[in-house]
Amino acid sequence: MKSNTYELHNYADLNDMARATDSKDSRKRKTASARGEKYSLRQKRQKRGSNEDGESANLADFQLELDPIAEPASKSRKNAPTKSKTKAPPLSKYRRKTANARERTRMREINTAFETLRHCVPEAIKGEDAANTNEKLTKITTLRLAMKYITMLTDSIRDPSYESEFIGECLEESANREARVDLEANEEAEVELPVPVAKKPAKTKGSGKKSSAASKRQSQKQAKIVPQIPPISSGESCYATSSIGSPASSAYASLSSSSNSHSSSSSPGLELDSLVGLNGISALDSLLLDTSDGDSLSCLSPGYGSLLTGSGESLLPGCRGDLPMSGLEKSDVELSLRLLDQSSKDSFDFASDQQPSACISSFSALDGYPFDLLHSDFPDMFLT
């Protein structure tokens, strides 16, 4: 019975319990809705959260689309102040700066003018108070004293007896002051001039080597610049003197005097040329003048002109050839030629194509004379 009753009771209880649970759930829902408990709110929030998540995803996508559009705007805002800095200042700022500079210049000129006017006003007019205080006069005081001094000078011009002594002292003082100011200005100018300081060359180990190398280079350059003098043989000097057509002694005398006078005022290179010319002339003397033949100087007799001229033409035509005449000046040689041979118009009109043999061949006419002027091998020497 117990089991049956229990079962029946259980069945009854189950039904009742089902009904009771349904009623309880409804009550709980009502109370939950009335009280607003957390469970119901959570469910609502979850629903709202799901909706919000979708909306936030949509918003994120929309923001991603808008970000590349917004970034250049921010960059342009950042670049804007830099561009404004590089721009030129506005016109008002430029005008203000120029006006300030103009005002400074004007005030500087005014101050300079008042300072000059203070120096022009003598101390006697300023009075003892200003001299004792040693203070700088104000601009108004300076103007008043200057006006007073100007009126005194005008009155003295009109009336010479008007405070002549006082004005004389003022003028003397101003003159002394001007002299003092000039001296001070000169001293200031000397002080302002920069004095060049001579820097001592720094002594290094390789300085001596460098200086020696530089001196060697300079000496080599100077040696290259000095012209080399070609050696002149005795034959060339004989030919040069023989073409002139003067006796050896007179040519030697004239050339030696010209070479001495020329060497005193010429360069070392020309002195060497004159020495070479003298050596050639001495060789010519040895050829033309023989110690055993004392009659060779008979060419200096008055009949020497007939020796040079035969049948109205000169036996020794002027020929120079292409040999250089070192150490000889044209004026001296030409003078000696004109004195010895008056029939020639110009002793330097030599033919350029004439050979030395043509000049020497004219000496064959001198064979009839008693003295031996030329040696037998003399023409061969010129031909070699």
From Swiss-Prot:
Cell location: Nucleus
Alphabetical keyword list: Developmental protein, DNA-binding, Nucleus, Transcription, Transcription regulation
Tissue expression remark: Expressed almost exclusively in the attachments sites of the somatic muscles to tendon cells in the epidermis.
GO molecular function, one term: DNA binding
BP terms from Gene Ontology: cell adhesion mediated by integrin; imaginal disc-derived wing vein specification; mesoderm development; muscle attachment; regulation of DNA-templated transcription; somatic muscle development
Gene3D superfamilies for the chain: Helix-loop-helix DNA-binding domain
Composition bias type Low complexity, residue spans: 209-224
Chief location bin: nucleus
Region spans: Disordered: 1-101, 187-227
Quaternary structure and interacting proteins, as annotated: Efficient DNA binding requires dimerization with another bHLH protein, possibly with da.
SMART domains tied to this protein: HLH (SM00353)
Residue ranges of domain bHLH in the record: 94-153
Transmembrane segments: none
Protein name according to UniProt: Helix-loop-helix protein delilah
Function: Probably plays an important role in the differentiation of epidermal cells into the tendon cells that form the attachment sites for all muscles.
